[in-house]
């Protein structure tokens, strides 16, 4: 009888041991379920309603989604998003990588540390301050036009954010030279984790720095590329603060992006049902692009 009781007690402890790790993360899942999953599901449901954010809520089926096809502002915003997304990915995977390669090749430790801190310091500056600084740079009486006038290029002086021909390009050029930030640190840490033995072996074969970049560094940084591309895609779909402060989507809709259009529909026109439909479409597009990125960007090991 004692043996049976002892066996039962051990069985209970064994079951508890198996579920114990899940109990520790249960509060996190409850919080995510309450504040993330519930709100996401609720927004998807409300996308089928004509809803003002209050009590007025009328089921209209797919009408909000059908309205997107005739929404010229949404169409323009998607075109702008495509351009911004492509240029953002190019900016993220090129210049920060080049700067990380440069720092890795600096032989003086003090000089390398100086460059690291120089690229990191701008991260602590509030983004609103940086946005307003660039708004002044692009102003008709701002720094950019002042430099152009100084070097004799007055014919290029224009209202960069107020001209439909230059507004989108100015938004893309915002925060030039796109070096400082987490992208630089991610590439730098990835390069530092590549075993020295790999470099020593290829140096004996007389490989050039350019060959080293394309045949060793870039393949072994596939994980970093994948992470940065995913975060860039998500940021491009969700971010609109700098556009709101720089141009507010104008002139016209030349710099409008879907996230800002969603914001306007929600808090300017109180068309919450349509805004939920916009959010649902953006969520599905972001998920699809992230899935493609995760599936086709393979992370090799250093041994390969």
Specify the residue positions occupied by each region the protein language model found.
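Short, Lys/Arg-rich, polar N-terminal cytosolic tail immediately upstream
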Residues: 1-16
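A structural signal for multi-pass alpha-helical bundles of membrane permease subunits
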Residues: 17-304
């Amino acid at each position: 009888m004692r043996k049976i009781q002892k066996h039962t007690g051990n069985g209970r402890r064994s079951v508890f041991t198996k579920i114990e790790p899940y109990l520790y993360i249960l509060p996190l899942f409850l919080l995510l379920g309450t504040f993330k999953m519930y709100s996401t599901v609720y927004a998807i449901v409300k996308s089928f309603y004509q809803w003002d954010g209050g009590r007025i809520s009328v089921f209209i089926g797919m009408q909000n989604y059908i309205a997107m096809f005739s929404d010229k502002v949404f169409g323009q915003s998607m075109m702008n998003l495509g351009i911004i997304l492509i240029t953002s990915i190019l900016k993220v995977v090129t210049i920060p990588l080049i700067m990380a390669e440069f720092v890795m090749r600096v032989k003086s430790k003090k000089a390398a540390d100086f460059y690291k801190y120089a690229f990191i310091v701008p991260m602590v500056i509030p983004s609103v301050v940086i946005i307003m600084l660039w708004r002044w740079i692009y102003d008709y009486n701002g720094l950019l036009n002042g430099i152009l006038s100084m070097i004799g290029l007055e014919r290029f002086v224009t209202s960069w954010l107020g001209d439909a021909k230059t507004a989108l390009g100015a938004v893309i050029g915002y925060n030039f030279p796109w070096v400082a930030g987490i992208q630089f640190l991610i590439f730098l840490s990835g390069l530092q984790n590549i075993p020295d033995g790999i470099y020593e072996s290829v140096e004996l074969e007389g490989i050039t720095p350019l060959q080293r970049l394309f045949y060793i560094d870039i393949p072994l940084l596939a994980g970093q590329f994948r992470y940065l591309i995913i975060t860039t895609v998500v940021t491009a779909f969700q971010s609109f603060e700098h556009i709101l402060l720089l141009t507010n989507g104008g002139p016209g809709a030349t710099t409008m992006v879907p996230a800002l259009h969603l914001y306007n529909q929600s808090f300017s026109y109180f068309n919450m049902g349509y805004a939920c439909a916009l959010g649902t479409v953006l969520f599905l597009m972001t998920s699809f692009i992230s899935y493609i990125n995760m599936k086709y960007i393979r992370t090799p090991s250093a041994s390969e």
